[in-house]
């Protein structure tokens, strides 16, 4: 199973970083929507954002999080293996796609930033 970011870190540490904020094109991140990023029945990496977007009734918890996502709060992105990936904000990413946005606000995380908070 492909994982976008294999390192382990805490969200609180990520949120505490002082990062540049930019407007970020969703087209750079849509590859993530097919990955099983979310849990189902307590088992991690079972449900993709696209599955929820196609069948919200089948995934009510994730559908609710997408519907309630606050797009004024930036997502966290990092460049890995030649492409951009999301560290925090997958439900916000799905919400932006659902709402037909073309860009979102994002905090840019560098490899050095991630190394600083990796356990």
Language model feature labels by segment:
Residues 51, 55, 111-119:
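Amphipathic, charge-rich alpha-helical segments that serve as recognition/docking helices
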Residues 1-28:
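N-terminal leader/domain-start detector
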Residues 73, 93, 102:
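Glycine-centered loop/turn positions within well-structured domains
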Residues 69, 100-101:
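Short loop/turn hinge sites at secondary-structure boundaries
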Residues 32-85:
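Short alpha-helix boundary/capping and kink motifs at helix termini
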Residues 83-99:
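A sequence-level detector for short glycine-anchored, His/Arg-bearing signature motifs
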Residues 79, 109-110:
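Residue-level "edge-of-site" marker
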């Amino acid at each position: 199973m492909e994982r976008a970011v294999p390192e382990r870190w805490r969200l609180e540490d990520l949120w505490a970083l002082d990062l540049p904020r930019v407007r970020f094109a969703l087209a750079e991140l849509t590859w993530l929507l097919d990955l099983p990023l979310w849990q189902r029945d307590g088992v991690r990496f079972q449900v993709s954002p696209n599955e929820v977007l196609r069948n919200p009734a089948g995934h009510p918890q994730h559908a609710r999080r997408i519907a309630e996502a606050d797009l004024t709060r930036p997502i966290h992105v990092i460049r890995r293996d030649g492409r951009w990936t999301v560290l925090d904000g997958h439900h916000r990413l799905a919400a932006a796609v659902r709402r037909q946005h073309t860009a979102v606000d994002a905090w840019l995380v560098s490899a050095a930033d991630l190394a600083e908070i990796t356990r």
